[in-house]
Amino acid sequence: MAAMFNHPWPNLTLIYFFFIVVLPFQSLSQFDSPQNIETFFPISSLSPVPPPLLPPSSNPSPPSNNSSSSDKKTITKAVLITAASTLLVAGVFFFCLQRCIIARRRRDRVGPVRVENTLPPYPPPPMTSAAVTTTTLAREGFTRFGGVKGLILDENGLDVLYWRKLQSQRERSGSFRKQIVTGEEEDEKEVIYYKNKKKTEPVTEIPLLRGRSSTSHSVIHNEDHQPPPQVKQSEPTPPPPPPSIAVKQSAPTPSPPPPIKKGSSPSPPPPPPVKKVGALSSSASKPPPAPVRGASGGETSKQVKLKPLHWDKVNPDSDHSMVWDKIDRGSFSFDGDLMEALFGYVAVGKKSPEQGDEKNPKSTQIFILDPRKSQNTAIVLKSLGMTREELVESLIEGNDFVPDTLERLARIAPTKEEQSAILEFDGDTAKLADAETFLFHLLKSVPTAFTRLNAFLFRANYYPEMAHHSKCLQTLDLACKELRSRGLFVKLLEAILKAGNRMNAGTARGNAQAFNLTALLKLSDVKSVDGKTSLLNFVVEEVVRSEGKRCVMNRRSHSLTRSGSSNYNGGNSSLQVMSKEEQEKEYLKLGLPVVGGLSSEFSNVKKAACVDYETVVATCSALAVRAKDAKTVIGECEDGEGGRFVKTMMTFLDSVEEEVKIAKGEERKVMELVKRTTDYYQAGAVTKGKNPLHLFVIVRDFLAMVDKVCLDIMRNMQRRKVGSPISPSSQRNAVKFPVLPPNFMSDRAWSDSGGSDSDM
C-alpha cells in the first residue's frame, strides 16, 4: 500500500469514494428513525369546535394505508442504496489491490539484475555461486526520459541496453514488441523484448553476431520497416537520457541517442524460446548458450554453402596401406573463415582474418583509367623489375632498355586523352590506384615519357629488322645462283619435256619447246595404265638410271688412265659376267645417291621459298618513315626536358637514314636478279599482281616430290633383293648397297620416309 500513496491521485480517489459511500448511509438512518415520520390530517375549519360524538367506525382507516405504502418505498430505497454502496466499495477495494500488485511487479522487474558476459573471449572456468555477480539496483537507480526508463550496462566490452516503457499504449495492450540495437559498424545486434503484463518472463538479451562490442552510443531502431498505425508521426521524440550508472566500471559510459526509425534496417532472426519462470533471479542464473564453433576453425553450426569441387570418391583398401591412411592423422588445417570468404556463395559482410576490422583500401581507390585496364597496367608494372626512379633516369639520359621491357611498356601506353586526364588530377594522389599513381608521377617527371619509349622501341627493333632484311636479300641472291648453276635440275626438266611431248604427240600440246613450271607439281597425278606407278616415278627412275650409267662410264674412263691395272681388269670382267638385269640394278644403285642429294644442293632455294616478298619490299620504306617521325617527335622534347636522350637519338636517326638508303639499293639489285632468273625458266611468268618469288616455291615442292620417289625406288630394290634366291655366282659377285651421302635423305625426304623401318 505504500507504493500507492506515493502518487496524489489515489488519495483523492479514495476521499471521493468515501463521501459517496458515507452519504447514503446517513440518509438511510434518517429514513429508518420513527421520529422523522409525521402524519398530517386535514382540518375542516380553524374554529375549535369539537366534533360530534359518532361511533368509531371507518374514519381512522385512510391514515393507516398511507403510512404502510410510504414505509415500503423507504425500505426499497434503503436496500437499493445499500447494494449499490456495497458494489462500489468492493470495486474500490479491488482497484486499490490491483494497483498494489502492479507496483510490486514493477519493483520486482527492476530488482535483482544479473550481469554476465555472454561471449567470453576464452573458455570460462566452471561456474560457482561466488563467481556470479549479482547487483540489485534500486528503482530510483533508473533514469527517466520521456516515457522510457532504462540503464546502460557495459559487460566486458559488450554493451547491453535494459529498458522499458511506462504509460505506453503498447504495454497496456499486452502485446510483445522488439527493438533492434545496431552499432555504428553493424558488427553486432541485440534484440530486447518487452514482456506482457500478464506474464513474468524476464527480459532476454540475445547477441546476434560474434565479435567485439560496439560502443555505448548504440542507436535503437525499430524492427518493423513501417511504423505501426497506432503510433502517430507527430509523437515527439524523447530527449537523450543522462549518463547511466555503470555496473562493473567506475567511469560512467555515455548514453545512447534517442531511437531512430530506419526502414532499411535488416530484420533480426526470430527470438529463441524463453522459459516461463516466475522469479527473475532463477531464470537469470543460467547464461544464454554461446554460439557453437566447428572443428575446423571459423565454421559455425550453420555452414556457409561453398562452391563444389567435382571429383570421384575412392574407397580406401583395407588390405594394404595407402597414402590416404596418413592424411586423417595429419596436422594440416585450413582457415574456414577465409575459405568461406573466398569460395562461399554468400560472402557479403564476411571479413578475412588478415583484414580484421580494417577497411578494404581498394574500395577507396580512384580509377582514372578503365578499371580492367588499370589492373592489367598494374600487373605489367610490377613485372618490370625496375622502379619509377630508374625508369625516369633512363628516359632522360637515353640509356638502353631491355627489348622485352620496352614492349611491355608500349602495350600499356595510355592514349593522349588518358594522359591529359591523369595530368589534370588535382586530388590526393595517395587515393589513386597503383597504375594511376605510377603514371601520374611518371608523366609529371617526364611529360613525353611514352614518346621517348616509342623512340627507344624503334631503336631496339631497328637493328634486328635491318639484319633480317639483309639476310633475306642474301638468300634470294644465292637461290638465283643455284638455279642457274645446277645441271641435274635442268636434266630433270629435259626428261619431263621429252616425256610430255611423247605423251602429247598428235595434239595441240605436243612438240613443246618449254612448259610452265607449275606442271611439275602435276606429274604425280598422271598414273600408269595399271595404276602402280606415275609419270613422276617413271621420269625420276630414268634419270637415276642415266646417272648410274654416267657413273660407270666415268669409272671406266678413269680406269683407262691406269693401264694394266688389276682393278680395272677385275671390274671390267665383273661387268661382263653380270646379266642385263643385274646391270640395271647396278645403275640404279649408283644413280640414286646423285639424284637423291639434289634437294640438299638447293638449300638456299628452299629458304628463298619461305621469304615473304611483301615484307622484304616494305621493310626499308617502313624504317624510313618511322625514322622521320621519330626525328620530328624528338625535336619537340629538346626544349623542356633535354638531357642526353635528344643528342643520342638524333645521332642514331642520322645513321638510320644512311643505312636505309644503302639497303634500298641492295634490294633493287636482288629483285632484278630474281626477275631475270624467273624469266630464264619461264618467260613472262612475272606479271603485275603475282609473287615474283613463286618460282622458288615450285622448285622446293618439286624437289620434295623427287626425294619421295627416290625413297620408293630404294625400298623396291630392297624387297626384290630379299625375295630373289641367291645363286652361287651372285654369292661370289655380291654387290653391296652403295654408301649414300649424308645429304641423301635430308629435309622433307627424310620426314616422308617414316614407314621405311617397317618395310625393311
Swiss-Prot record:
Residues 296-732 form the FH2 domain. It is a single-pass membrane protein. Residues 52-63, 253-274 have a biased composition (Pro residues). Residues 1-29 form the signal peptide. GO terms for biological process: actin nucleation; cell tip growth. Its main location: membrane. The chain crosses the membrane at residues 78-98. The keyword Amino-acid biosynthesis does not apply. It holds the Pfam family FH2. It is found in: Cell membrane. Keywords: Cell membrane, Membrane, Signal, Transmembrane, Transmembrane helix. Interacts with profilin. This is Formin-like protein 8. It comes from Arabidopsis thaliana (Mouse-ear cress).
